[in-house]
Amino acid sequence: MADGKKLSSLDASFLYLETPEMPMHVGSMAIFRLPDDYKGDFFEDFKAMIVSRLHIAPILKARLEKAPLDIDHPSWVEDDQFDIDRHIFRASLPQPRDRATLERIVGWMHAKLLNRARPLWEFYVFEGMKDNEVGLYSKMHHAAIDGGAGAALTNMIYDISPTPRKVDPPTAGAKPGPEPRDIAANLLDSYQQFITQPLDASAAAKNLQLPRTGKSDIGSILFDNAMYQIESAVRFAGNIPTMVKSVSEVLGKISDPKSRESLASMVSPPTMLNKSISSERSFAGVSISLSRSKALAKQAGGKLNDVVLALASGVVRRYLKEHSTLPAKSLTAAVPISLREEGNTEANNQVFGMICSIATNIEDPKARLEAIIAQSTKSKEMSHPLRALMPQISNISMLGAPMMMQILALVYSRSNLSDVLPPAANITVSNVPGPRQTLYAAGAELLHIFPVSISTHGQALNITVQSYRDQLDFGFIVGANIIPHVQVMCDMLPEEFAALEAAYASPVADIKGAAE
């Protein structure tokens, strides 16, 4: 990560939207098993391993640097006072020191804001658990990372064998920067670069790079922002044909009567899950078989994500029905979709989302899954043309945005507007692909990695799943004022999975919950 790299508008938005009731960090609850003959200090071994690899994950040593007067997005700069002991902590669990206890502690910890004066991440190591297990709760601000980058970071930090791999130390000495040049000379170079581009105006516009001062005084920030706005305007103009095509496709779909029916199904009914949340969280996790889930998706003619949505739908439907609050109209889910290209491991956010009906108005599990497959296919078709627009929208920058966005977020939070406004979606469901091979850290085998995501005003429940080896690890996080004990909801998932398998005549094997 280049020192002084300014956050994109999408990354920075997670900072501006953050309030004490709505922290914007993501994390995980990992479970390790120590070797039977292990005699060391896992906390110290783990910390030493992280220290030796900090240079291959530069985001771990980067802190935020605000622009003067908050007139522009902040930048990532290397923390010259970085102290590993402010980021990795030894923690203890009360009796009975099992996974259920760890889940309750993780829910409490996840509600606490990260210190913005330091790099925005923390690890907590819980030793002394049952069955020679060790728990690891990690959290990192969403401004620095999305699910795809998080999975890449996992592969960077962990090993694929019990013996830690050797990592080359960082290269000594900093690379010399470019010689300072007169700003007029840089402008001339940029102009020459632009006019010598191929005749393809779109390509020339996309490749335009105007000079920056790279300084942090107000005058330089104003100049750099002006250069950025010019670049953005030129690139926007260069992308007009693509954007016009995307908008035309969207309008064409909307004019189709069948598409209008699909859009109507995406309107979210109000539920108990769509209220303002407190600063407290409830968390729980559970695992099911990945291969069996894929087989189920194949039998149903859908994708793995459809099965994930069907399981979330079944759990939410059952919970609301038991509390006599299930609406007649189907609930919807906000589903993040990654824009990250294969091999891209940059620590930033490259996502957009779609809204999908999850057929909670259908009782039969098989019919519900089939309806979800049909609805998700239509939602993808509706949202596909918007993919081309997302890079333009996510890079919009405006002077003064930090202050204005933070004021609006605070007003939204304090006024409880989500209690009266119609919800954009009822729940959030996210599926993050993870490693298929077994991972290790400091010689300990990684058994599970349960995601711990974000609960927001108006969408109190977030269900995120991470694939690992031959399992799907589900993490349920919710505002505790809405659902005080989300473990109750989490325990329903194995039963919903069994019901789906029974509907498709698949064998049902044991399913292990995170809290067992």
Sequence positions of predicted segments:
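Soluble acyl-CoA-dependent acyltransferase catalytic core bearing the H(X)4D motif
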Residues: 1-10, 29-42, 47-459, 463-494, ...
